């Protein structure tokens, strides 16, 4: 086992293995290169690239930065820019999509409806009508959707998620569209159980209504059943959060099902934003990042999910289900690898229940390879993968073994909410979404400084200002090719990863509040 692990570490310490038609980090499974692709590889459709342009963009030496040709292809004059990696993988494994979704309930019911009853307006090919907040159909709710997917071990999962996750979100929102439209009424505990006119601030009847046997009066058909216990009051935004969480789960399950019929390689992180009824919902599963820059202030809108940040969850799972470790790993963490000569000595360690450190007597089991190994960007789960949440990776195994890693990975996103109506946003207030290729080399503060220096020097009425700002961020992170590789400011090493960046102006949210 030690030889296998050393081989795995050698393969992965520089980053997750990337191969456009590779074998899931050495794992084998239902998906294979002999199967057809679920969707063909390409760059985001809103870029409007020809096939020749897509091929030219895959230049690992020149690394040209791609930007929007037409700003009207994206809502809110959103800016977007991307660049391919410096040779880590054949293709740019980042994917992005942006659309305006219209969610419409099935006539006569508020129960779950098939996807055919939702309408989805694509931002392609010309993006006309993207600025509309509501369409003419009173039953529908319109929302904006932005997404970034950072693929690893191939682009298959990222491509599929970029095409289908928005459909799952629309389908989940169908169940609650009528509830969301009436913010004055609390969501019912059971659909159809409580009268639609029940106010959010209370469910009491006047004496006159009770005597008349009106709706909600004792004995009336619409009277809720008598309860002798309290019920939680669930706010509307929690329903949207639940819908997004469910959509991520369904997307992951679909990838799992379809990998037997299609070649869906690898996995991907997922970072999405949904603007619905005046609120931004930012859902993140992985190590991409979102921040709001408002009047120079930095507001983090996501957390990164890595072996280090999720150490206790991973250790607890391994403690409860030790068979997942294949008798090859230990769930305990030590400051370094334990050596056989240290048996019987006391060494610092951490378990799932600990944020601090303590000493324990070293036993034979402690000689096994640690579940989490490495620090910072080099930390890996089972010496294999550096992110702990995302989509796909169903066939991922520890190198040269039969130990699956998927049980330790989660598709559940963290969702944060930003109420646009609470602030009057200016032209320089933006939401930044970017894959880890940007954040690996630039801090939140450096990104904010770049934005606050760049945007004020642009014409506020220039629709390209946010695209140029996104291009500037990508350029700062990529750097300039020199004798010693790509270099950024202060001669630091630039990002050799794929980089994708949205710059979303929040001033357009003022119209929604």
UniProtKB/Swiss-Prot annotation:
Residues 109-133 are annotated as: Disordered. InterPro entries: PP2C, PPM-type-like_dom_sf, PPM-type_phosphatase-like_dom. It catalyses: O-phospho-L-seryl-[protein] + H2O = L-seryl-[protein] + phosphate; O-phospho-L-threonyl-[protein] + H2O = L-threonyl-[protein] + phosphate. The modification Phosphothreonine is found at residues 113, 223. Residues 77-506 form the PPM-type phosphatase domain. GO terms for molecular function: identical protein binding; phosphoprotein phosphatase activity; protein serine/threonine phosphatase activity. Its EC number is 3.1.3.16. The modification Phosphoserine is found at residues 7, 123, 210, 220, 421. Transmembrane segments: none annotated. Its main location: nucleus. The keyword Phosphoprotein applies. Signal peptide: none annotated. Belongs to the PP2C family. Dephosphorylates CDKN1B at 'Thr-187', thus removing a signal for proteasomal degradation. This is Protein phosphatase 1H. It comes from Mus musculus. The gene is Ppm1h.
């Amino acid at each position: 086992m030690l030889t296998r692990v050393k081989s795995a570490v050698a393969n992965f310490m520089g980053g997750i293995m990337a191969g456009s038609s590779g074998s899931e980090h050495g794992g084998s499974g239902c998906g294979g290169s002999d199967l057809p692709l679920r969707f063909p590889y390409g760059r985001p459709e809103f870029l409007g690239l020809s096939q020749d342009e897509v091929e030219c963009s895959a230049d690992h030496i020149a690394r040209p930065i791609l930007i929007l040709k037409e700003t009207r292809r994206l809502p809110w004059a959103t800016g977007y820019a991307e660049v391919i990696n410096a040779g880590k993988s054949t293709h740019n494994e980042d994917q992005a999509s942006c659309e305006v979704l219209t969610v419409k309930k099935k006539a006569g019911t508020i129960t779950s409806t098939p996807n055919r009853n939702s309408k989805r307006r694509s931002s392609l090919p010309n993006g006309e009508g993207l600025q509309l907040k509501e369409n003419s159909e009173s039953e529908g709710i319109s929302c904006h959707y932005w997404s970034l997917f950072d693929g690893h071990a191939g682009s298959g999962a990222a491509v599929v998620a970029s095409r289908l996750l928005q459909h799952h979100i629309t389908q989940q929102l169908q169940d609650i569209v009528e509830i969301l439209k009436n913010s004055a009424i609390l969501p019912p505990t059971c659909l159809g159980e409580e009268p639609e006119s029940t106010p959010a601030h209370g469910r009491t009847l006047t004496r006159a209504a009770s005597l008349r046997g009106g709706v909600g009066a004792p004995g009336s058909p619409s009277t809720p059943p008598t309860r002798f216990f309290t019920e939680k009051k669930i706010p509307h935004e929690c329903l949207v959060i639940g819908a997004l969480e469910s959509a991520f789960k369904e997307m992951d399950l679909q990838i799992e099902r379809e990998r037997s019929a299609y070649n869906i390689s690898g996995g991907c992180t997922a970072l999405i934003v949904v603007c619905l009824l005046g609120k931004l919902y930012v859902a993140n599963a992985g190590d991409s990042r979102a921040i709001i820059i408002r009047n120079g202030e930095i507001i983090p809108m996501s957390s990164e999910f890595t072996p280090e940040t999720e150490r206790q969850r991973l250790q607890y799972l391994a403690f409860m289900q030790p068979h997942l470790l294949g008798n090859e790993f230990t769930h305990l963490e030590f400051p370094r690898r334990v050596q056989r000569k240290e048996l019987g000595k006391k060494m610092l360690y951490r378990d799932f229940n600990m944020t601090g450190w303590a000493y324990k007597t070293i036993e034979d089991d402690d000689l096994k390879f640690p579940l989490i190994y490495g620090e910072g960007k080099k930390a890996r789960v089972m010496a294999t993968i550096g992110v702990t949440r995302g989509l796909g990776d169903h066939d991922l195994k520890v190198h040269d073994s039969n130990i699956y890693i998927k049980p330790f990975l989660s598709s559940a996103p963290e969702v944060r909410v930003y109420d646009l109506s609470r602030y009057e946003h200016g032209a320089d207030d933006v939401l930044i979404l970017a894959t880890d290729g940007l954040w690996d080399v630039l801090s939140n503060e450096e990104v904010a400084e770049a934005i606050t220096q760049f945007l004020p020097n642009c014409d506020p009425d220039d629709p390209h200002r946010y695209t140029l700002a996104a291009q500037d961020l990508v350029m700062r992170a990529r750097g300039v090719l020199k004798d010693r590789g790509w270099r950024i400011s202060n001669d630091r090493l630039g990002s050799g990863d794929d980089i994708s960046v949205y710059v979303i102006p929040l001033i357009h949210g003022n119209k929604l509040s």
